[in-house]
A protein has these predicted regions:
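Conserved C-terminal active-site "lid" loop/helix of NAD(P)H-dependent oxidoreductases
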Residues: 38, 203, 239, 262-300
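Mid/C-terminal beta-alpha module of Rossmann-like enzyme folds, strongest
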Residues: 212-275, 310-322
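Flexible, glycine-rich beta-alpha linker
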Residues: 116, 160-177
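Conserved Rossmann-fold NAD(P)-dependent oxidoreductase catalytic core, especially the SDR/UDP-sugar
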Residues: 94-134
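NAD(P)H-binding glycine-rich loop region in Rossmannoid oxidoreductase-like domains
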Residues: 50-90, 98-101, 116
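N-terminal Rossmann NAD(P)H-binding glycine-rich loop of SDR-like oxidoreductase domains
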Residues: 3-23
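Substrate-positioning beta->alpha
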Residues: 172-178, 192-214, 221-225
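Catalytic helix-loop patch of NAD(P)-dependent Rossmann-fold dehydrogenases
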Residues: 86, 90, 120-167, 191
Length: 322
């Protein structure tokens, strides 16, 4: 059996590769990406731009193979609008066309919680999506493209769509990493509030759940929010990081009425800090995502939130989170 991972050079793809090789040492993994990464010989790298049709002339592809579609433009804000649509929508079209061409019957698609839109209310899988960013819109359209592919042969095709919260772990270089180093350098301050809900999932848990669904989902379309249940507040996340890593940092709170004008001024000055009103609003807003469906799916979590942070810390020789 072959596993094709689009965007396999990235954070989630790297962890999935490690898990696949751990469970299936003799499997063949193909990393389809524009960034070369053979992951120490664990995968076969093939240059692939998902914005263009996918042709694999030298690989024997069978209907029993599996596609993990991770390729995406996702940092928001950070890209021009057309980049989200170009990569995420054309990518979905070309990946599903590749599956169609070779008769591949199973796809796992990593979407996002962005299709829910920005709002404080709890979002379940049955919540009507109301995306309010180009990224969120492009991801919702990409979900529909994958769903159409499945519907063309619904009795045989298996599609799992996951909407992860903030994914953290070794190599993420994202929100949790910045939070840790901000705490460590005494530069982190709560933006506007301490009760902001930040739904999240450990990367090792996410890839384990993906394989679990492959084994327990025969056909049809399924959609899962992927987050710890219940989701944690930023204050709880900070407290856990402090406890596990021994930082014991106290973070002050900056009121929103101070923070927003300051962000506007800093943004106008073009400071290389990534600070602007849009990013500050994102920091202050909750990602209040319900993980109950995942919790009730029969899947057993390998880590509590605290254990996940501790495992990540251990992966960095108990020195830091990175």
């Amino acid at each position: 059996m072959n596993y094709f991972i689009t965007g396999g050079s990235g954070f989630i793809g790297t962890h999935l590769t490690n898990l696949l090789k751990e469970r299936f040492p003799h499997c063949h993994i193909y990393n389809l990406d524009i960034v070369e990464n053979s992951q120490e010989g664990k995968v076969t790298y093939i240059y692939c731009d998902v914005r263009k049709p996918i042709h694999l002339e030298e690989v024997t592809v069978t209907e029993d193979d599996v596609i993990f579609n991770f390729a995406a433009v996702h940092r928001t804000p950070g890209h021009s609008d057309h980049e989200y649509f170009e990569t995420n929508i054309l990518g979905a079209e070309n990946v599903t066309a590749f599956a169609e061409k070779y008769g591949i019957r199973r796809i796992v698609f990593t979407s996002s919680i962005a299709p829910y839109g920005a709002a404080e209310n709890l979002k379940e899988e049955i919540t009507v999506p109301t995306p309010n960013t180009p990224y969120g819109i492009s991801k919702l359209v990409a979900e529909k493209i994958h769903t159409i592919w499945q519907a063309k042969n619904s009795s045989e095709r298996q599609l799992t769509i996951v909407r992860p919260g903030v994914v953290f772990g070794k190599g993420e270089n994202g929100n949790f990493t910045r939070l840790y180093w901000g705490l460590r350098g005494r530069k982190f301050m709560y933006p506007g509030r301490k009760d902001t809900v930040k739904a999240c999932i450990y990367v090792k848990e996410l890839v384990c759940f993906m394989l679990y669904r492959l084994e327990h989902h025969e056909q049809g379309v399924e959609l899962y929010n992927c987050t710890f249940e219940p989701a944690y507040t930023i204050e709880q996340i900070v407290a856990t990081m402090n406890k596990v890593t021994g930082l014991n940092r106290t973070a002050p709170l900056i009121p929103a009425w101070i923070l927003m004008p300051a962000a506007a001024v800093i943004g106008c000055l073009g400071a290389p800090m990534g600070i602007c009103p849009a990013r500050v609003r994102k920091l202050m807003g909750s990602t209040n995502i319900c993980g109950k469906k995942l919790a009730d799916s029969g899947y057993h979590f390998h880590y509590t939130f605290e254990e996940a942070i501790a495992d990540w810390f251990k992966d960095n020789d108990n020195q830091y989170l990175k």
